[in-house]
Amino acid sequence: MSTPLDHIRNFSIVAHIDHGKSTLADRLIQLTGGLDTREMKDQVLDSMDIERERGITIKAQTVRLSYKAKNGEDYVLNLIDTPGHVDFAYEVSRSLAACEGSLLVVDASQGVEAQTLANVYQAIDNNHEIVVVLNKIDLPAAEPERVKQQIEEVIGIDASDAVEISAKTGLGIEDVLEAIVNKLPAPKEGDRNAPLKAMLVDSWYDSYLGVIVLVRVIDGVLKKGQTIRMMGTGAKYPVERTGVFTPKMVQVDDLGPGELGFITASIKEVADTRVGDTITEDRRPTENILSGFKPAQPVVFCGLFPVDAADFEDLRGAMGKLRLNDASFSFEMETSAALGFGFRCGFLGLLHLEIIQERLEREFNLDLITTAPSVVYRLNMTDGTHKELHNPADMPDVVKIASIEEPWIKATIMTPDDYLGAIMKLCQERRGIQIDLTYVGPRAMITYDLPLNEVVFDFYDRLKSISKGYASFDYNLSDYREGDLVKMSILVNEEPVDALSMLVHRSAAEKRGRALCEKLKELIPQHMFKIPIQAAIGGRIVARETISALRKDVTAKCYGGDVTRKRKLLEKQKESKKRMRQFGKVEIPQEAFIQALKMGDD
């Protein structure tokens, strides 16, 4: 079934969220007859419910399209649909490494957005040929000429012959297919008789077939019955089936050079298949290994605890299942005095955290509490050693720490001019350092250096509310810098609550401590004794609120009578309250944790 190399095109679609990339993929599949009308549904490549609901792509998907071009030749087009969100940039990087060209989809009414830039630069770094596609051309607000000029000014690629389409109505889709055939290059190199060399693009778990591995063959032929070897891990597996997605799974006899397809080989766990690894034949291995791309490193950490302690084992099982499909999600067990048993989890960013939490709650029917998200700090100890700190509650004694370094990001924000002042003020409040400000038509593009710690809480939400949803934001990690950071503990009735401790910059500690104490005062119910809520840095209290005691009227039964009798009862009540305060436990309701942790700087 191997196709001649010059008739294969491997391409991906690069776009900002909501610019219509999955809809364009739907139209391409429909036009090339990948699915008939009955099987067609919107966003056919977004297979998770959560992807459809939020209108975002999380897992990169692939599909093989057969197209008869206007020149009468038959072509095989391998499309990889990539996510647009910054958290899933590693999905984008592996998709781009398997292609030679990209379609850059830009909304003709909105123009270039921050994540368009991030992903298109990745494509340029991979030496991709880029075809510009202007989508939503049917909207009254569409300004194709302005957007073309913007693409040339901001990205620096020629957009004069951009394909103008409407993915929704199907207008111009044929022109996109012709542009793919005529402008994008065919796969390079590839010798059918050379030893097998293939790149592992992705892998996911299927309950019937085990692990399905998506591969891009570079040299040699991959077919059923071969014993393959993963060059990175040295593991060997017999190939059980080879096939392609149309987007239905279709088995084929073999996969030749330049082709994209899947294999199953009785692999039990996704962790055994490292993305970017080189696959070769065990009997006749290849000499040179492909330069794999770097695995995704977790950036944001938080604790996940079941609301009901009895669900702990279910949560462990659910996380194991999610880990099968998402190698970038990591977790380890932890215990908290306030919340019981749970897990410390690592994520690629806040959207990733939200999606994992939502999938756990939805697919496995679990009720969860998440602790405050934190980033990875580096501690330089006085004895010359270095440590990584994932959980503020585990911070060693301040005396042993020489300095603390925190991760900084380079953030690119694109916004209409009207909101520029408010956004710059927000970045300044978050300790941002302005690097650059340029204008592209009526939109401003600002570049800031920001501490990641200030972004993980609610920066994105605040940015969207300040700009009424018009600003777009993209970031990448730049480096670690020393900061004046302190651990803030929250004490309830003079007992520290580990789930609420956090590392904050000294300048913001008092403000955040006061806000958290005020919030907890509203959320913790009154007890029979007075409860102090304090925010402390080391031994110093920086904020305090007091929940007053419930008062039982102990003198109600004294009808008139001697005042000393009343005083005796009141004194007795006072004594027992004092004792209660000493030994009584404050019950902090689960809702209080959830609400307090949702709190930003508002």
Swiss-Prot record:
Coiled coil: none annotated. Transmembrane segments: none annotated. The keyword Ribonucleoprotein does not apply. InterPro entries: EF-4, EFG_III/V, EFG_V-like, EFTu-like_2, G_TR_CS, LepA_C_sf, LepA_CTD, LepA_IV. Its EC number is 3.6.5.n1. It is an enzyme of class 3 (hydrolase). Keywords: Cell inner membrane, Cell membrane, GTP-binding, Hydrolase, Membrane, Nucleotide-binding, Protein biosynthesis. It is found in: Cell inner membrane. One of its GO terms (molecular function) is guanosine tetraphosphate binding. GTP binds at D18, H19, G20, K21, S22, T23, N135, K136, I137, D138. One of its GO terms (cellular component) is plasma membrane. One of its GO terms (biological process) is positive regulation of translation. NCBIfam families: lepA, small_GTP. This is Elongation factor 4. It comes from Brucella abortus (strain 2308). The gene is lepA.
